[in-house]
């Protein structure tokens, strides 16, 4: 198995507590409301905390697909969230799992700094393709921007 690590950083004008609430606490409800392609996020096992398995159902290229997320950490006090994509048809054939470690911190002018570490655990000697990485980054950025946009458009959300 190979492990390939990628780091990302973004800034937001939204305060970290509010952004964490949208990205983590309320994500199962908000994400399908603000992103048309995401149809549902439902718990299939667990209570929402570490060990919980969630099924994210989405439409891509006219087909309904899903991925399974395993929650590994939810730290509301420190605005941190770790999870892995562990299954589903949205997971590339050459990848065993993709792990995400996300952390928000206070940024300039009351906003946030978002840091994300992504690890691809590949099967055998497989290497994630540039296309897989590019598509994964684009999807992640799209979700981040959509939920950030929701917070900006709804200033009473907190």
Curated annotation (Swiss-Prot):
Highest taxon, organism lineage: Eukaryota
PROSITE patterns cross-referenced by the UniProt entry: PATHOGENESIS_BETVI (PS00451)
Pfam family, one: Bet_v_1
Cellular component GO terms held in the UniProt record: cytoplasm; nucleus
Induction comment: Upon contact with the plant pathogens fungus Fusarium solani.
GO terms for MF: abscisic acid binding; protein phosphatase inhibitor activity; signaling receptor activity
Gene Ontology terms: biological process: abscisic acid-activated signaling pathway; defense response
Gene3D superfamilies xref list: 3.30.530.20
Keywords for this protein: Pathogenesis-related protein, Plant defense
Family: Belongs to the BetVI family.
Record protein name field: Disease resistance response protein DRRG49-C
Organism: Pisum sativum
């Amino acid at each position: 198995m190979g492990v390939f690590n990628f780091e990302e950083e973004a800034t937001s004008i939204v305060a970290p507590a509010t952004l964490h609430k949208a990205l983590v606490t309320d994500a199962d409800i908000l994400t399908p409301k603000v992103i048309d392609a995401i149809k549902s996020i439902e718990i299939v096992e667990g209570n929402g905390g570490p060990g919980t398995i969630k099924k994210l159902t989405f439409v891509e290229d006219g087909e309904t697909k899903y991925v399974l997320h395993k929650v590994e950490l939810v730290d509301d006090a420190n605005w941190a969230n770790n999870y892995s994509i562990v299954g589903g048809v949205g997971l590339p054939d050459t990848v065993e799992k993709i792990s995400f470690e996300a952390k928000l911190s206070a940024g300039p002018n009351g906003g946030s700094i978002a840091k994300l570490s992504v690890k691809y655990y590949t099967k055998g000697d497989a290497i994630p393709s540039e296309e897989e990485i590019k598509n994964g980054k684009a999807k992640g950025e799209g979700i981040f921007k959509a939920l950030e946009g929701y917070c900006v458009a709804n200033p009473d959300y907190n």
